[in-house]
């Protein structure tokens, strides 16, 4: 570029500025949530009860929900450099193909994770924490996992194609809307209001970031491929998983080894049903394409 320092500054300030501002806004949110929740729980324990409920969500449920995203990071490591390279070289069609693959694979992975937590979240929380509240949070937020995971992947892709200013803008608006939602909903509805804030926040950021990425890259939307097919596989897996959960109910009431066995059998069976349903719907095609592009021994371009 003609002015590399200016170009570097245009990249750095939205990214680093976004992190600093997001950190400040998240701190404000974390301070407001217990205070607003204490208003709702004024006659049921006040601030101590508010901190307990908020701690269950933040310290128990959310770490479990975000754990599978670490596995999805492998996909990011494979695709993000290629997305950035295609953008820099002006390879428009290749960029569209890579974005489509990223969105499609993320949809399948996040749908599977959502099904697992929706079906097995309560038994898992009971096994790990002996907490019914944590299980309720896992079950409630599980359907939003595709939005949460897509949001994170799309945010990285936007920065890879030079749209970090837009990502920064949407992040700021999201934080402001979250704070407004906390102040408006928590004093009236308690933790259910905060769960609604999380769900609406995920919907807004996912829609805003994905829409901007598709528009800026010229990629045609294919929501039936990205969300429709994964949702169909998820419904079939959820139906099988719920039936199996009823059959294994005695195992979850037994000693720890039997609980672990029941959870392992149920999780593996649910995963198997999902993969069997998703493979002919497009997962097999994308997995084969990803393997062909990154198989060991493949000559690099």
Q: Where in this protein do the model-derived segments appear?
A:
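Membrane-proximal transmembrane or re-entrant/amphipathic helices at the cytosolic face
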Residues: 244-301
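Short runs within selected transmembrane alpha-helices of multi-pass transporters and secretion channels
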Residues: 136-162, 166-186, 191-213, 270
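Alpha-helical transmembrane segments of polytopic membrane transporters and translocases
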Residues: 14, 49-72, 104-105
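Interfacial segments at transmembrane-helix termini and the short loops linking adjacent helices
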Residues: 118-148, 152, 253-257
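Hydrophobic alpha-helical transmembrane segments in multi-pass integral membrane proteins
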Residues: 182-183, 235-251
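Interhelical loop/hinge segments that connect adjacent transmembrane helices in multipass membrane
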Residues: 1-22, 90-93, 215-231, 292
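Short alpha-helical transmembrane segments in multi-pass integral membrane proteins
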Residues: 1-4, 8, 98-118, 124, ...
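Helix-loop junctions and terminal segments of transmembrane helices
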Residues: 66-90, 96
